[in-house]
Amino acid sequence: MSNDRTVRDGFLATVEQQIASGDPPEVRATRDRLCATGLSPGEAAQMIAIVLRNEMKQMIAESRSFDNARFAQLLEKLPALP
């Protein structure tokens, strides 16, 4: 398995855990909203994982802590991807 796929799978697993736990609540709400537009739960989770991965990259590049408010704002923009 390639490193990129391993990383992608890790972010997807994180999103699935967040959906199951409801923490943060914006992740489950975004999944539900995307599914209401016709996406499958898997497709919605993949889109959320892309946003999470991009936000984590930005966090590292800027040497800052995770910003949940910023993450929530990015989720609101889905299905448009960053």
Show the residue positions of the predicted features:
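Structure-specific DNA junction-binding interface
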Residues: 1-82
